[in-house]
Design a protein with these regions (language model features):
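Non-catalytic structural scaffold of enzyme domains
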Residues: 1-247
């Protein structure tokens, strides 16, 4: 069985969430059936959104340090749970010595398998402005809907003032309005395109048809490591948050 290397710390809770989803997605009867996982919880990685918006330091040097440490420790391939960090992947790839599985491409391919034609993106401002999901979905022939500026701000605040701040309760009225507006615009499902958003779905009981990019990546990683997935994500028009985010 291959060893998974997780470039983590973006943020720490999201890193734990990805690792937990890998463990829960693995068909295992005993400890020895589980996949070896190495995690570099590098909290020195600068904020990715700030870097994309030209307001902060590039995360590339620290991302590369994490990749090198994981490679040296024996990882067979790399993943990272931070959607926004994938914007910098082209700058990392020339220096990586082992394969990297992209959360963005994996999620886009999953949307295609479901037969979706139009999806909404719930993500940080950095991810929305980076164009990473727009390019990946366009490549597989799927239209993407982005939140309005007000919706983007509401989602950003929920991520930073809610989940990252460790708040167990948070007023999501503006976020729920954003979901309703995007549904009216034709969104068949929503990609949870920031690693904190699946946590927000669970913590703050958001309602909608959600595609958890973290869960999709976790199941892809399980397969790539040579283990069996205990339960495949459903291939249907919509995937409810309870089906993806809570098992």
């Amino acid at each position: 069985m291959k060893t998974i290397g997780i470039i983590g710390g973006m943020g720490p809770m999201a890193t734990v969430d990805l690792m937990q989803k890998i463990i829960l997605a693995t068909d295992a009867c005993e400890d020895q059936d589980h996949i070896p996982i190495l995690v570099d919880n590098n909290t020195n990685i600068p904020d990715r959104t700030a870097a994309i918006l030209g307001q902060g330091t590039s995360p590339v040097p620290e991302l590369l340090k994490s990749a090198e440490r994981l490679t040296a420790q024996g990882a067979d391939f790399l993943i990272m749970g931070c959607n926004t960090a994938h914007f910098f992947l082209p700058l990392l790839m020339p220096y990586l010595k082992i394969p990297f599985i992209s959360m963005i491409e994996t999620t886009a391919e999953f949307c295609k398998q479901q037969g979706l034609q139009k999806v909404g993106l719930l993500a940080s401002a950095g991810t929305c402005h980076s164009g990473i999901y727009q390019r990946a979905l366009q490549h597989v022939g799927i239209e993407i809907l982005l939140p309005t500026k007000a919706g983007e701000t509401a989602i950003h605040n929920m991520i930073y003032a809610g989940v990252k701040a460790g708040k167990q309760h948070y007023d999501t009225t503006d976020v729920q309005k954003t979901l309703q507006d995007m549904c009216r615009a034709g969104a068949e499902a929503f990609i949870l395109g920031c690693t904190e958003i699946p946590l927000a779905v669970s913590l703050y009981a958001l309602e909608g048809n959600f595609l958890d990019a973290t869960q999709i990546l976790a199941e892809k990683a399980v397969t790539a490591a040579g283990a069996k997935v205990i339960r495949k994500l459903p291939i249907s028009k919509t995937v409810l948050s309870t089906e993806i985010s809570t098992y």
